[in-house]
Amino acid sequence: MKDTLFNQSLNKRFCFDEKVAHVFDDMLERSIPYYHEMLDLGAYFIAQNLKENINPKPLIYDLGCSTGNFFIALNQQIQQDIELVGIDNSMPMLKKAQEKLKDFNNARFECMDFLEVEFKEASAFSLLFVLQFVRPMQREVLLKKIYNSLALNGVLLVGEKIMSEDRILDKQMIELYYLYKQNQGYSHNEIAFKREALENVLVPYSLKENVALLESVGFKHVEALFKWVNFTLLVARKT
């Protein structure tokens, strides 16, 4: 279903409710440059890591899993038996995910606040365009929990919208991103109304800040797998 949510101002903060869930896949594809390419790239690196670290049934968490797109990408890349656990606090999103993955018997979904979850030891975690919605004071706490729950040589994927630490460059990056959205069919009003709804809800860090945050919780190896203007995909490995 096409995303037309912001044809007019919602007069409220952005939230992942039923209206958003209905159009979320279209919103992702038209709002995140190279979205599916980043999912495939992340799935590839997890698959390669699993090949090099033998586990009879590895556990993979997707936090803020929304409609389950990353699990589809993982199932296309990974041939071995895996356990996939998607956690999201939006039941409308999870209903979409369950519907899309009904033919896979290796995925289950839990409607919870992932900040409150006690994770089992896992081979991989993913936070794909999710950390930016976590309150800044809670990001380090969440990442430390993930680090402590990762098996040795396990990996964490972090996809984020980012900002530049230089005011002029940041303005130019945002302008280019808005041009991208216009080319995807969003009007000036839709872009402005969504920006208004996301204010103080989506709080981006710079690439340097995100890397420093991952290093502060214990990750010694953090790499940017992909970057387009103000979007990036990072991988961090526990050693």
From Swiss-Prot:
EC number(s) stated in the UniProt entry for this protein: 2.1.3.-
Catalysed reactions, as listed in the record: prephenate + S-adenosyl-L-methionine = carboxy-S-adenosyl-L-methionine + 3-phenylpyruvate + H2O
Residues where S-adenosyl-L-methionine binds: Y35, G64, C65, S66, D88, N89, R195
Recorded GO MF terms: carboxyl- or carbamoyltransferase activity; S-adenosyl-L-methionine binding
Single Gene Ontology BP annotation: tRNA wobble uridine modification
Top EC category: transferase
Keywords: S-adenosyl-L-methionine, Transferase
Membership in a protein family: Belongs to the class I-like SAM-binding methyltransferase superfamily. Cx-SAM synthase family.
HAMAP family: Cx_SAM_synthase (MF_01589)
Subunit structure: Homodimer.
Role description: Catalyzes the conversion of S-adenosyl-L-methionine (SAM) to carboxy-S-adenosyl-L-methionine (Cx-SAM).
Name of the protein in question: Carboxy-S-adenosyl-L-methionine synthase
Organism classification: Bacteria, Pseudomonadati, Campylobacterota, Epsilonproteobacteria, Campylobacterales
Gene name linked to the record: cmoA
